[in-house]
Curated annotation (Swiss-Prot):
PANTHER family: NON-SPECIFIC LIPID-TRANSFER PROTEIN 2-RELATED (PTHR33076)
Function: Plant non-specific lipid-transfer proteins transfer phospholipids as well as galactolipids across membranes. May play a role in wax or cutin deposition in the cell walls of expanding epidermal cells and certain secretory tissues.
Family: Belongs to the plant LTP family.
InterPro entries per UniProt: Bifun_inhib/LTP/seed_sf (IPR036312), Bifunc_inhib/LTP/seed_store (IPR016140), Plant_nsLTP (IPR000528)
Protein name as catalogued: Probable non-specific lipid-transfer protein 2
Cleavable signal peptide: 1-31
Amino acid sequence: MRTVSMAALVVIAAALAWTSSAEPAPAPAPGEEACGKVVQDIMPCLHFVKGEEKEPSKECCSGTKKLSEEVKTTEQKREACKCIVRATKGISGIKNELVAEVPKKCDIKTTLPPITADFDCSKIQSTIFRGYY
C-alpha cells in the first residue's frame, strides 16, 4: 500500500516541477532514483489531493516548491512526466481539481496540465506548462 501512496504523489510533484520560465543548464533527467526523491518531497500532499484534508500541509507546500525549483529543462519535464505515467497506472482517488489547487494554495506560480495515467509526455514544451500542447 505504501508504494501506491508514494506513486500517487509523484503525480503532484512532477506536475508542479514544470514551472520555469527559462531553461537553465541541464541537470540529470529524473529517473528511478529521482522519482523516489520526488515522492519523498511531496508525500505530505497525498491527503489533500485525495480530498482527505481541506488544505495542503506546510510540508506539502515546501516539498512541491522545492521540486518546482529543481526540474527545469524540457527533457527533465518529459522524464518526470514519464515517471508520473508509470506511477499512476491503476491508482484511484487522486482528484485532478485538487492537484490543480496545490500551487494556488501553496503560492507557487504555475499552471498544471491534466494529470492522468495516459498523458502524452511528448506534448510538454520548454517553458511554462501553459504551452504544453
